Amino acid sequence: MPDKPYRIQTPSGHRKYLCSGLYLPSVTTVLSATESSKSKAGLRQWQERNPGALQAAAARGTAIHKCCEDFLRGIEVSCPDEYRPFWNGMDQYLEWFDELHWSERPLRSDWNHLRSEDKEVAFVWSTEHKYAGCPDLVGEIGGVKVIADFKTSTGPYTNTFPERGDRIGYGGFRKYQKCAQQMAAYRLALGERVGFRCDVALIIVSTEETTQGIFIDGDQLDLYEQRFIKRCQMFHENEDNNETEDCSQQELPEQNEPAKVC
């Protein structure tokens, strides 16, 4: 039986995972750290212009993730009024799933080794490419294996490169590409850990006005997987060339690309 995974906070506040004896960065850490200097500067400027917006978005995302998880587990959904516009419409996409294997944590006993010691959290990880993370949903729709991710946003996502000058479209395209790489990374790690290879990915995006379901087929996921692997290599090369935190003494807890848009 593989070692139980653990989630660890480093002295600087970053999140790492101890899996199979390796201290691994999260998928989102890899993606954020390997953004271009221009993108990082743009995010800093946006945060300066919109104080508190990042924290508000995180709180909104946490609330909607809780609604999705409760719905999938057959628990009555109690959505705070301020987030209800973001929840409305998400359930119609969740109802497509006729078989569930993972909802934040494994729903099948043969995947329980992916749970932490206290069973409160669970992760998938790649020992080959050295990263870890937690998918939102893995299941099946009509026998098709699907990995899904829940997103809330102030604007819609788009899977096609926008016209020149379309700043909103460009933002939606960048978010789509980042999420596609994130799900490709989870898909790869899940296959490495339990031999379950998802056929497609589904991004479920909610805004105050609408909800989108964007499918990404297997061929596109393969391309995004290669992009993520390159970013992993870049991340670890940079980590090797810089002074890194020693996590070993930390106390362990007890615990322009088309896709179908629906």
Predicted regions located by residue number:
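Intrinsically disordered, low-complexity regions enriched in polar/acidic and amide residues
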Residues: I8, K119, Q181, S248-Q249, ...
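Mg2+/Mn2+-dependent nuclease catalytic core
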Residues: R105-E239
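Generic recognition of cysteine residues
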Residues: C19, C67-C68, C79, C134, ...
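Glycine- and charge-rich intrinsically disordered segments
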Residues: M1-P2, N238-C262
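Short, surface-exposed secondary-structure junctions/capping segments
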Residues: S37-G42, Q233-T244
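Detector for intrinsically disordered, low-structure N-terminal pre-sequences
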Residues: T29, G143, F228, P258-K260
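Metal-dependent nuclease catalytic cores that hydrolyze phosphodiester bonds in DNA/RNA
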Residues: M1-A132
